[in-house]
Amino acid sequence: MADDTLTLTLSSGGDVVIRLRPDVAPGHVERITSLVREGFYDGVVFHRVIPGFMAQGGDPTGTGYHGSSLPDLKAEFSAEPHVRGTCSMARSQSPDSANSQFFICFDDAGFLDRQYTVWGQVESGMEYVDALPVG
């Protein structure tokens, strides 16, 4: 992991390079990078993949109902748009409930703008995200 990027190595064999955005979501970038350093995401699947919308991962149980043992994060909503390749934090109905789950947008999803914390943008390897199995 470089200081301004992180690389997800997918079990399907592809690498996804994400440019981090600490300028818009410093707390969330710190959370993601600390979990990466701990190996939290190693072997974690994308448990929710909706074609034309997004792929969601970050739950160690693979069910979509769990996160890390760390406290939830305060929202860092911004004007950054949800476009193809945007990396954003998943959450429950509470704005301040993001923890470890995140999603990558397949296409523009402007209806999420200012409601979910954007923390990165895929720089390369989006074709591997596109190839994730639906589920």
What are the roles of these predicted feature ranges?
Residues M1-G135:
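Cyclophilin-like peptidyl-prolyl cis-trans isomerases
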